[in-house]
């Protein structure tokens, strides 16, 4: 009897532990995007790091960037990490058992401060492999930090982040793949997929009561980097962001660090795609008002963000952890400074 009771108590304890783990994630099944909950700290602030275009088994300074991320993560009391896509090069993962997952993620981002949830979107390189593999729960069994979906929401109380699957927007991937094969199993029709995604995003944005609204995608809307602006996003996604009071759009794709403003809205465009290979050396001509370009760095690095009810602070760092650019804005004072 005692043995049976101990077994029952053990099973109950295990179930309680599982429930504690999964309270971090609250799934909303009412037609909106899947939602994850990240409680703010006791002082009400939220801090995170943004990294993109990184997974190269430590090469191209990926390990050095990871080391500096760990130091900054400790300094800002990191809550979670955001990945803007192109998580594994050159062609994503070939399966959920691909050793590249541990070689480029688990074995690289080992600092204590980085042992938090990683919220990731897919990039175009991820779509060149088995895109479904990165979404698999098998990876979370290997490394519990890993959260990757096509599109979803992270609710951090005063900050709400809307992650958008931008690769299916880009029409040239369907017609001019340059010899690459894309995993379109979940995208049988480009137009219907994008239409449904935009509808779900708009519903989520309109229902948001967050002080700060951030949209995260892989592709840039505004960029003077190698790839430049993404026409489809500017035509189809940007109007929804403007209509719903989005404060920031964060992306990767261009292997650089970058900050640009919008011409006719308060939205700031922040590129963090310098997690490993960078230094392309080519810059697209600025076709908009050059005053809208606040910062550009063609090298490795990452970005941190800290939010309170009234203030936001964005900081860009290089591979040595040196501050390259800092931008602070206040919603109370309704002005910003560089």
From Swiss-Prot:
Main location: secreted
Reactions catalysed according to its record: a phosphate monoester + H2O = an alcohol + phosphate; 2 a phenolic donor + H2O2 = 2 a phenolic radical donor + 2 H2O
E.C. designation(s): 3.1.3.2, 1.11.1.7
Keywords associated with the record: Glycoprotein, Hydrolase, Iron, Metal-binding, Oxidoreductase, Secreted, Signal, Zinc
Residues annotated as signal peptide: 1-31
Textual note on the cofactor: Binds 1 Fe cation per subunit. Binds 1 zinc ion per subunit.
Reported regulation of activity: Inhibited by phosphate and molybdate.
Residues binding substrate: 253-255
Disulfide bonds: none
Residues binding Fe cation, per UniProt: 53, 86, 89, 255
Subcellular localization(s) per the UniProt record: Secreted
Transmembrane segments: none
Signal in keyword set: yes
Cited InterPro entries: Acid_PPase (IPR024927), Calcineurin-like_PHP_ApaH (IPR004843), Metallo-depent_PP-like (IPR029052), Metallophosphoesterase_PAP (IPR051558)
Cytoplasm keyword on record: no
GO CC annotations on file: cell surface; extracellular region
Tissue localization of expression: Expressed in roots, stems, leaves, flowers and siliques.
Catalytic center residues: 227 (proton donor)
Induction profile: By phosphate starvation, during senescence, by ABA, by H(2)O(2), and by salt stress.
Listed SUPFAM superfamilies: Metallo-dependent phosphatases
GO BP, sorted A to Z: intracellular phosphate ion homeostasis; response to hydrogen peroxide
Subunit record text: Homodimer.
Role description: Metallo-phosphoesterase involved in phosphate metabolism. Has a peroxidase activity.
Name this protein carries in UniProt: Purple acid phosphatase 17
Gene: PAP17
